[in-house]
Design a protein with these regions (language model features):
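Active-site and donor-binding regions of nucleotide-sugar-utilizing enzymes
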Residues: 5, 12-22, 59-160, 165
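Conserved nucleotide-sugar phosphate-binding/catalytic loop shared by glycosyltransferases and other
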Residues: 24-68, 78
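A nucleotide-sugar donor-handling region in carbohydrate enzymes
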Residues: 32-37, 137-216
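Donor nucleotide-activated moiety binding/catalytic core segment of transferases
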Residues: 75-79, 83, 168, 172, ...
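A donor-sugar binding/catalytic signature common to diverse glycosyltransferases
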Residues: 92-94, 101, 141, 269-313
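Nucleotide-sugar donor-binding patch of glycosyltransferase catalytic domains
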Residues: 295-337
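C-terminal amphipathic helix plus adjacent low-complexity
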Residues: 331-365
Length: 365
């Protein structure tokens, strides 16, 4: 059996194309993936894979640096028990959030091999340390780019590095075949936006190392979109220190400017989100979706701040700081069109990763 750690809303976009091609597996859903405030992506996983999801609850209230550290400790204890109970052949972890590191530790210290997806990347903050620690603990590696694979090899010396691309590109490719998304399909609250007209998607998280600045930073981003004259779909941020301040800024700005057409929601199902992203005039914020999926979809991105600073990027990205001139950048960038870029893959990563994981389990790793 393969155990797949699902730790947050964005991770499911990358994991589902792999899960679609696995047979003997269990999804261990934990942290914010289980919580309504963050979109409860575990519920989507339960719909997609009935009987395959095991929930683990550990998240503490507060969204501060201290509660983040304590969350990791609580989750480590829980995952150690879960892995001891199900005794998987491999534990799969994704990327760089702190919750993934607890899964790697809980598995590795019980002599369960770890397969790490999306190692070797750089974002310019503490996530780099977590990502590299996951790679160091892992036996098998599935980086998303050639440069990332070189970094993983330099770090680990492993002969088990498989550069198949990012699985979320598979989902983006599939989403383009779907009919356009309407505001009624995504739920949430606010103005009944017409997604056939120009609009922005705002997806912005607190800067990892500046949680106390989250309110002012989000307010600057929102004011920029508003001053650019773009209706906006605002998706609530994920579970990070400073998240409550980011959410407060959304409430303050939208209430202060009722004339601005906005719609807010906690989350959108992964494939539906990617179809919606393909319809947007621009993605604004600091989500890795702008770096990965938006590059494949050819969607312009105004990437704000330092959260994604070190990422490999295609030509659709315009990097800016938090300042009063954001609106001018958004006006210009939102009018641009870009070709599809295959930097993070061409849409076949999921089936290839699943095949390799299945092969490894059959060999007894």
């Amino acid at each position: 059996m393969i155990a797949v750690a699902l730790t947050a809303r964005p991770s499911y976009t990358k994991l589902k194309p792999i899960l679609d091609h696995l047979e003997d597996f269990v999804i261990v859903s934990c942290a914010s993936a289980n919580l309504v405030d963050y979109g409860e992506v575990a519920l989507q996983a339960e719909r997609d894979f009935p009987g395959k999801v095991r929930r683990v609850y550990s998240t503490l209230a507060g969204n501060t640096l201290q509660t983040t550290a304590k969350d990791a400790g609580v989750l480590l204890q829980s995952l150690a028990d879960v892995f001891a109970d199900i005794d998987p052949a491999i534990v799969v972890v994704m990327a760089d959030r702190y919750e993934t590191l607890t899964a790697s530790i809980a598995a590795r210290y019980q002599n369960i091999p770890v397969a790490h997806i999306q190692g070797g990347e750089r974002s310019g903050n503490v996530d780099d340390v977590v990502r590299d620690a996951n790679s160091a603990l892992a036996a098998y590696h599935f980086p998303a780019t050639h440069l990332a694979s070189l970094r993983v090899h330099s770090l680990t010396g492993s002969q088990h590095i498989y550069n198949y691309g990012c699985p979320s590109i598979d989902l983006a490719k599939q989403a383009l075949l779907d009919p356009p998304v309407t505001v009624q399909e995504i739920g949430g609250a606010g103005a009944p936006l017409d997604f056939n007209q120009r609009f922005a998607i705002v997806l912005h998280h607190p800067e990892t190392e500046q949680p106390n600045e989250a309110f002012n930073q989000m307010r600057t981003v929102l004011d920029g979109v508003r001053q650019a004259g773009l209706p906006a779909l605002i998706i609530w941020p994920g579970q990070d220190a400073g998240r409550d301040l980011t959410a407060k800024a959304v409430r303050v700005v939208t209430q202060k400017h009722p004339e601005w057409s906005t719609h807010t929601c906690r989350g959108v199902a992964p494939r539906r989100f990617l179809r919606l992203l393909s319809q947007a005039s621009v993605l604004v914020g600091n989500s890795s979706a702008g770096i990965r999926e938006a590059s494949y979809l050819g969607v312009p991105v105004v990437n704000v701040g330092a959260r994604q600073r070190g990422r490999e990027r295609a030509g659709n990205i315009c990097d800016v700081e938090y300042d009063d001139y954001l609106w001018m950048v958004m006006v210009d960038v939102s009018k641009l069109k870009f070709p599809s870029a295959a930097l993070y893959g061409s849409g076949d990563a999921g089936i290839r990763i699943a095949a390799k994981l299945t092969e490894l389990t059959r060999k007894g790793v």
